[in-house]
From Swiss-Prot:
Belongs to the XFP family. The keyword Methyltransferase does not apply. It comes from Mesorhizobium japonicum (strain LMG 29417 / CECT 9101 / MAFF 303099) (Mesorhizobium loti (strain MAFF 303099)). Its cofactor is thiamine diphosphate. Its EC number is 4.1.2.-. This is Probable phosphoketolase. Gene3D superfamilies: 3.40.50.920, 3.40.50.970. Pfam families: XFP (PF03894), XFP_C (PF09363), XFP_N (PF09364). One of its GO terms (molecular function) is aldehyde-lyase activity. It is an enzyme of class 4 (lyase). PROSITE patterns: PHOSPHOKETOLASE_1 (PS60002), PHOSPHOKETOLASE_2 (PS60003). Keywords: Lyase, Thiamine pyrophosphate. GO terms for biological process: carbohydrate metabolic process. The lineage of its organism: Bacteria, Pseudomonadati, Pseudomonadota, Alphaproteobacteria, Hyphomicrobiales.
Amino acid sequence: MNDHTTIAASGGRLSDRELHDLDAYWRAANYLTIGQIYLLDNPLLREPLRLEHVKPRLLGHWGTSPGLSFIYAHLNRAIRLRDANVIYICGPGHGGPAMVANTYLEGTYSELNPDIAMDEQGMRKLFRQFSFPGGIPSHAAPDVPGSIHEGGELGYSLSHAYGAAFDNPDLVVACVVGDGEAETGPLAAAWHSNKFLNPARDGAVLPILHLNGYKIANPTILARIPEDELRALFAGYGYEPLFVAGHEPALMHQRMATVLDDAFDRISAIKHAARNGSGATGSRPEWPMIVLRSPKGWTGPKEVDGLKTEGFWRSHQVPLSGLAENPAHLKLLEEWLKSYRPEELFDAAGAPVASIRATAPQATKRMSANPHANGGLLRRSLELPGLHDHAVSLERPGAVKAESTRVMGSFLRDVMRLNEVAKNFRIVGPDETASNRLQDVFEVTERGWMEKILPEDVHLGREGRVLEILSEHTCQGWLEGYLLTGRHGLFSCYEAFIHIVDSMFNQHAKWLDACREIPWRRPIASLNYLLSSHVWHQEHNGFSHQDPGFIDVALNKKADIVRVYLPPDANTLLCVTDHVLQTWNRINVIVAGKPPSWQWLSMDKAIVHCRAGIGVWDWASTDDGAEPDVVMACAGDVPTLETLAAVQILRQQVPDLRIRVVNVVDLMTLQPKEYHPHGLSDREFDALFTPDKPVIFAYHGYPWTIHRLTYRRTNHDNIHVRGYNEEGTTTTPFDMTVLNGLDRFHIVQSVLDWVPRLKGVRVSLKQAMDSKLLEHRAYICSHGQDMPEILDWKWGQDPDAAPKRPD
């Protein structure tokens, strides 16, 4: 435990008064942190500490906390001196009690939670609630004012920070990166975000690498490598590292104040040069960063039971445990708490003394009250173009072909154009914007890029609003940071590789879910995914690129958070895009193809269909509104195509068969209404799918997903699903469907298998379909492409009337 009694300025940047007040603030934050971890009662130690004052289960992380509060205190000083606009991202989010402590000292916590007042009773509640049933979580969760990053799963702090800084020219995002977190892949990639930050337009990110030396039970790499290697590493990333190292509080305060002043001066100079034309034209600045080396568990017990604790991994969580069994630990805890001299920090009522309160900035300059950290306060609706202005015109279903995502790209181009002044919309992706056919956006913007631009480069520019880096983690982190600070965006990615961010998706979904229970958290714009180059269009890249399972990851989350859309054509894709860009506090997953494909619905019909999310396609059905013999359902663009091709075969071969075609755009409509707000009631579901007729369901993804969504439905036993069965290779597009049994011929066979009255035609027609499958196999192995009747198929023509191609 450190002795704070000899704090003196000793000729540094800080005066004696400044140093005293800064250190008092830090001591108060540390005291409040320990109190949250340990205490149920006696918050100010106004009586001897007894076992009944201590929580029965000790939860929390002390090791990182004093460093987090040390940084927080010094950032407060910088904000006050410069009237700066700063938010704090806590990479080591397990230091949650430190973040709560600082927001309490700033007064924000009590303003938002009036029952936890700044007095002794409020402090008692503050301590009791931490990591306690009915209380608050242990990390920097949404209930912590000023937090936009929980930091439970490590690796995303820096990408969140840069996302927050984009298009926020007056904002400085201080991002504390723990040295454990710095070992993760996502964090390593995120250091390159400085190649995309434009000081003329964007805010600044100040990374603060906190080297306290240890993870849970191991040393950290960056804390052990030589300093010249560490300096070279970050210089290679394009940063100017500024170092602060030590353990003695007075000296560390002076060093940190000096270095932080230097960092803010450099940030101001970079911005001024970029915005006044005095910087090197088009050059990327060398942004400052701070490397803070301080002991893990700083100011805590130096030893416990004769074993080193401060400055070692033993301080990571709870340095003193087993208090009921070891009275010496209880005594040591009391001494530790008293070492901060709480009687100097809190007045008779239990409130922080005036000098500590004055150390914090005021109003929205407080990091815990900055509106950028509650982005819903700043969110403004996007200006959106008219749907009909971008619609694919068609006289009848299947009359024309279009590239669905290219049509979406023209819509997004106009979203960019209409919101150019607001600068609140961006597209991110891992070098797949053009590949996914969204290239029309480059008519109005470029790819953001702060490195050298060569004469032969295309669509690169300093002002570009499309951000591309081949790290899905960084893309997701940028977009989350952008959304969390009140803006809008879209993540475009290959379907198979979006799995790289499965866990980030989970964390964001949990954040949104928790925010719903916090009244002061205002809704933010939804996280929107476009997944293209999907499983049925990856025949050229092969098995590694074929995976529709992200839908299943999404469906694991709470119903009120997640939406999954499978538009069958361009006009329905436009309707879905228009809708998701107007939603908030959701995660919307859109799966759509990019090759030229048949278009089915006019814009007016697409609007009606998408509004319902599901519906009967009367023009493809043969039941004439009567009870059908079979329901042929489809979800996804390729399943829809194959279903309609199968319907066409059946209409010719079994003309009296009553077929009802049901198309699903909004996958969540299949769930019962009591499980999802978009779900159909049982009566509505039965009206579409019947209570007892066979349903042949062609689905984009894994078949069991449909069974999972419909298992409570009346007719579930009659639902027979065809989808992706993990069969793939490099082959032809149609062969991908054949390998997985999703093709038209297998679908026809399913109808024959499950419609009882077709027994008379079953054998001959099934054999005909088997012959077609054999013919298909022989043809592709001979010619390397699909049969002409597949390539030239059209809705409404005789299946045998497709034009023949020469061999």
